[in-house]
Amino acid sequence: MNQMVFIHGPGAGGCAESFVHQLKHYPGSLAPTLPGHLEGEPCRSVERYTEWLRGWLWSKGKRQDLVLVGFTLGGSIALQYGLDYPDEVKALVLMTTGMRPRERRPGTLEFRLKAAADPETYRQWLETMRHQFLFMEPELRDHLIACHRKVGPLSQHRDFVVLDHFDARDRINTLKAPLLLIKGADDPAAQPEYEREIHEAVPGSQYLRLKNTGHFPFAERPAEVNLAIDEFLAARG
């Protein structure tokens, strides 16, 4: 029996609560809060986050048939897990995820650092987060903005640095788990098409590009994303 595991990133509140629609859709699914997102010490690399996640899952007796669904940092962790422990992973679903260091607009990291120290920049940072939620239902958007207030810009800065050092290009051809990649076609972050790069590097992978969807497909188009995951898993028994 599949064990669904949803892994969050620095966006969408920087919290596991962003997967509310998936947790309802998949009874028994899990969504850990990564260390450093209010509680615990943050990890300094995707590899260390992966080991933390594996320990967390093993402590719950979840060691096989894992379906890892990750967003941004969570997607990188899921990918690393699939590469390191292929016998434990049934399938991977990666959203807004790349296999190489991110290309960021100049000042992106500095903006988060300044937001942690300057009230006006902090306000601008929250408005930036709100703008990225333009495709999200208002109630969930407001809840995730409240999560961002708690977690704060420094946590997001640390996560960005971790992502900027992640590079799996030299191992991607060894990935064994079935792979579904999902991207919002109208992402206001205007990032490169990282998901297509992975799709082209992994034979047999599936790539879904959702229209009228931004940076957070699972929270903006939950019905479509859940259906895509259902069909992807059903096709693989």
Each PLM stretch: what is its role?
Residues 18-24, 29-69, 227:
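Active-site loop/oxyanion-hole signature of alpha/beta-hydrolase fold enzymes
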Residues 83-84, 89-119:
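Flexible "cap/lid" loop of the alpha/beta hydrolase fold
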Residues 213-222, 226:
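Catalytic histidine-centered segment of alpha/beta-hydrolase-like enzymes
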Residues 175, 181-183:
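Short beta-strand/loop motif that positions the catalytic acidic residue
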Residues 70-74, 78:
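Gly/Ala-rich beta-loop-alpha elbow adjacent to hydrolase catalytic centers
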Residues 19, 177, 191-200:
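Short alpha-helix in the alpha/beta-hydrolase fold that links the catalytic acid
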Residues 186-190:
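Acidic catalytic loop of the alpha/beta-hydrolase fold
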Residues 103-105, 120-173:
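Conserved alpha/beta-hydrolase catalytic His-Asp/Glu region
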